């Protein structure tokens, strides 16, 4: 339950771009304190950008929240957004194919090119995550820009690629999006 509130807090801060958190959130133990620190340095810290985005994205996914407005407000490169949307479209085309609907050759090829298992970013890995999963920092490789996050509950790791553009850290890749196998 505390983690749900923590994720809700991270989401609210991400959406509003605020650096303040309530005293209650700061008092929720080690995980709460980590979130407070992460949120405060989000614009200057590639690890925090990755951490906040993935945890808020997973929270939205679990809650069934339509994340289109939230998604557009996140620190993402245009290339990330394009590939993400292409993966979403490929999934819809694949669902039509599975339903036996007639699909153009162009759509079939598009689906083959951008297809992912189940959903963008997490792919089929989402089935192995717990409903209370929260990602924490595992490592950051400054040379490659890869931040490796690890789910504290299941141990599942997720790579997130960050790049600095005009002094601001942006996400260029995450999981199935722009991260080579």
What are these regions (language model features)?
Residues 155-181:
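Short beta-strand edge/turn micro-motifs at domain boundaries
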Residues 22-143, 177-181:
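Flexible low-complexity loop/turn motifs enriched in small/helix-breaking residues
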Residues 1-4:
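Positively charged n-region of N-terminal signal peptides that target proteins for export
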Residues 145-152:
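Short beta-strand segments that buttress and anchor functional surface loops
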Residues 143-145, 167-168:
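Beta-strand-connecting loop/turn residues
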Residues 8-15:
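Bacterial N-terminal signal peptides
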Residues 57-58, 152-154:
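Short, flexible beta-strand-to-coil junctions
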Residues 15-22:
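C-terminal segment of classical bacterial N-terminal signal peptides
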């Amino acid at each position: 339950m505390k983690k749900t509130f923590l994720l809700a807090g991270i989401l609210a801060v991400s959406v509003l771009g605020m650096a303040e958190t309530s005293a209650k959130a700061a008092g929720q133990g080690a995980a709460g304190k980590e979130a407070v620190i992460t949120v405060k340095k989000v614009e200057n810290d590639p690890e925090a950008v990755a951490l906040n985005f993935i945890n808020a994205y997973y929270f939205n996914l679990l809650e069934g929240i339509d994340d289109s407005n939230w998604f557009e407000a996140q620190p993402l490169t245009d290339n990330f957004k394009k590939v993400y949307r292409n993966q979403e479209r490929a999934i819809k085309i694949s669902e039509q194919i599975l339903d036996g609907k007639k699909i153009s050759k162009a759509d079939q090829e598009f689906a083959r090119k951008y297809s992912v298992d189940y959903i963008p970013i997490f792919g089929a890995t989402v089935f192995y995550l717990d409903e209370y999963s929260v990602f924490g920092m595992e490592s950051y490789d400054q040379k490659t820009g890869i931040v490796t996050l690890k789910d504290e509950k299941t141990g599942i790791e997720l790579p997130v690629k960050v790049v600095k553009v005009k002094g601001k850290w942006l996400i260029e890749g995450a999981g199935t999006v722009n991260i080579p196998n």
